[in-house]
C-alpha cells in the first residue's frame, strides 16, 4: 500500500509546481501594449530626456501699454458694459442728469436694464471716446462736486462736447484705465476699502491716474458685451390634452334620437 501511495503523492506535488512555472513564464513573456506605462520587470520605464514636456501654465505675453485704442467708426455706436475687477458694472442709479454714477453687481441690478449699458461714441480729440447711456441718452463726464472733490456723473451730450472725452489707457492684462480729459483724472472703483453704507454698490471716485509701477487694480475696467436678458434658443413645447371626441349615439339606445 505504501508503494502505491508514493507515486500519487509525488505527482500531487509536481503538477502545481509545473503549472505555476508555466504561467509565470507566460506572464513575463507577454507585455500588453495597451498598458501605460510599459510593463517591465523592474516597473515603469523612466521618460526619455528627449520627450517633449507639457507647457507650464502662466501669464501670456505682455500687451503693450501704448497700443492702439479701438475707436468706433462714426455712426456705429456699439453698446458695451464697463466692468471693474470687482465684478460690478458702471451704472446710472437715477435717470436724472447730474446724478452720481455707481458700480452695481450684476445680480443686484437686473431691474436697472439698459441703465447699465453705454454706447461708445468717437471723441472730439484724437484717441478719445465718449460714453452715452443707452437708456437715458446722457453722456458720462466728470466735474467738481458740490461737497468737494470731483464727481463722476452724466449730462446732456450737447453741452460742450469736449467735456465728455475719455482717453482709454490700455493695461498689460487687456483692461483699460479710463481718464476723463475734462479733469485729467481716472475712474476708480473703491471696492477694496468699501464701507457698509451701501451693500449693493461700489463707490466711484475720480483720482489721479496711477503711473507705471503703482497699484492700479481699482482703476482697471473691462469693456465688455452689454448686459441684456438672455433668451432661450429652443422654446419649450406646450403640452395640452386632446379635445374631447363627440359621443356617437348607441343604435340600441331607446332614449334620444337615432
Curated annotation (Swiss-Prot):
Residues with lipid group (S-diacylglycerol cysteine): 22
Cellular component terms per the entry's GO annotation: cell outer membrane
Bilayer topology: Lipid-anchor
Ranges of compositional bias, category Pro residues: 46-62
Signal peptide: 1-21
Note: The operon of the strain O128:H- / 9142-88 / EPEC is referred to as cdt type II (CDT-II).
Purpose: CDTs are cytotoxins which induce host cell distension, growth arrest in G2/M phase, nucleus swelling, and chromatin fragmentation in HeLa cells. CdtA, along with CdtC, probably forms a heterodimeric subunit required for the delivery of CdtB.
Protein name: Cytolethal distending toxin subunit A
UniProt organism field: Escherichia coli
Lineage of producing organism: Bacteria, Pseudomonadati, Pseudomonadota, Gammaproteobacteria, Enterobacterales
Amino acid at each position: 500500500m505504501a508503494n502505491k501511495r508514493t507515486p500519487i503523492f509525488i505527482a500531487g506535488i509536481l503538477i502545481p509546481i509545473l503549472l505555476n512555472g508555466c504561467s509565470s513564464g507566460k506572464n513575463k513573456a507577454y507585455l500588453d501594449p495597451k498598458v501605460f506605462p510599459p510593463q517591465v520587470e523592474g516597473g515603469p520605464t523612466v521618460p526619455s530626456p528627449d520627450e517633449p514636456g507639457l507647457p507650464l501654465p502662466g501669464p501670456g505675453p505682455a500687451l503693450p501699454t501704448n497700443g492702439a485704442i479701438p475707436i468706433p467708426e462714426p455712426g456705429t455706436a456699439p453698446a458695451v458694459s464697463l466692468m471693474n475687477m470687482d465684478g460690478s458694472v458702471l451704472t446710472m442709479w437715477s435717470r436724472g442728469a447730474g446724478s452720481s454714477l455707481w458700480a452695481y453687481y450684476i445680480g443686484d441690478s437686473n431691474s436697472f436694464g439698459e441703465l447699465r449699458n453705454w454706447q461708445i461714441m468717437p471723441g472730439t480729440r484724437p484717441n478719445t471716446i465718449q460714453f452715452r447711456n443707452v437708456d437715458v441718452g446722457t453722456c458720462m463726464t466728470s466735474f467738481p462736486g458740490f461737497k468737494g472733490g470731483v464727481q463722476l456723473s452724466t449730462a446732456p451730450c450737447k453741452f460742450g462736447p469736449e467735456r465728455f472725452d475719455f482717453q482709454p489707457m490700455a493695461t498689460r492684462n487687456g483692461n483699460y484705465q479710463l481718464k476723463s480729459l475734462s479733469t485729467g483724472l481716472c475712474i476708480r472703483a473703491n471696492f477694496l476699502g468699501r464701507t457698509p453704507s451701501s451693500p449693493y454698490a461700489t463707490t466711484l471716485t475720480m483720482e489721479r491716474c496711477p503711473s507705471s509701477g503703482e497699484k492700479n487694480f481699482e482703476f482697471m475696467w473691462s469693456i465688455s458685451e452689454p448686459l441684456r436678458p438672455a433668451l432661450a434658443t429652443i422654446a419649450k413645447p406646450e403640452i395640452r390634452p386632446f379635445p374631447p371626441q363627440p359621443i356617437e349615439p348607441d343604435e340600441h339606445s331607446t332614449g334620444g334620437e337615432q
